[in-house]
Amino acid sequence: MATIKEFNRCGEELEKILLLRTSPVAVKMLTKKADIPAGALRPKKDRKYHLAQCQAFAMTRRERATIAMLKEDHWCPAALMAYGMVPLPEGMNPTRMHPYECFSYGKYIGILTAPLKTAAFKPDVVIIYSNTSQLRSLLLSFGHDEIPQVNGRFFPPSCAHAVVTPMLKGGYWVILPDPGEYQRALCDEGEMMFAVPAEKLPGLLVGLNKFQEQGFAYRNNYYFMQGDFPRPDFYKKMFKDWGLEDY
């Protein structure tokens, strides 16, 4: 497992390489209050209001806030149930319509978030908010052996899929932000979420840094509409093998 400083450096590199508008979010599930760093915001205690978890993610990535959300800080039931902070209601299955993973009840007392580049703790999961072009560049940097590990979740609740799912199942997760992300946390319409288990992050950065030397790196993206556009040599060879070089 990487050190805290190494995780911080990963956060800096992700922002720089992908030109991210907001900070990747370091997420740690809490088993005891002693793990809450000094200065972390407790919404109900410190500001006398509650937040949905998507709003806490938004404040962390935009305002660079470290936030600890215990059950008394939450204002949306999905995260409380998914993170195992409350028992599932009797007589109903809240996961029936849009299935999602949940931690065992009582395993965790809360969730801690901070910008990855300044987090004072080792995360369990890192959530990257990006536009679709940034996400494409990130995914294209993956090696062939990693591609089968990329999965997607496209239904609510994204707060569960971005935290519980990668922790329980491993792998990489592309997540469509749910309505709460848009309506309450002010997620841009073009943004996607990408969740990475913390132990996979250093390797992801190795591949992403190597990818910067190739033409598909995000900073090399540009728009153009041109017939007979310049092609790489392997394109030319393929067309020659097909007998299409003279057409």
Question: What are the functions of these language-model segments?
Answer:
Residues 4-247:
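Acidic, serine/proline-rich low-complexity intrinsically disordered regions
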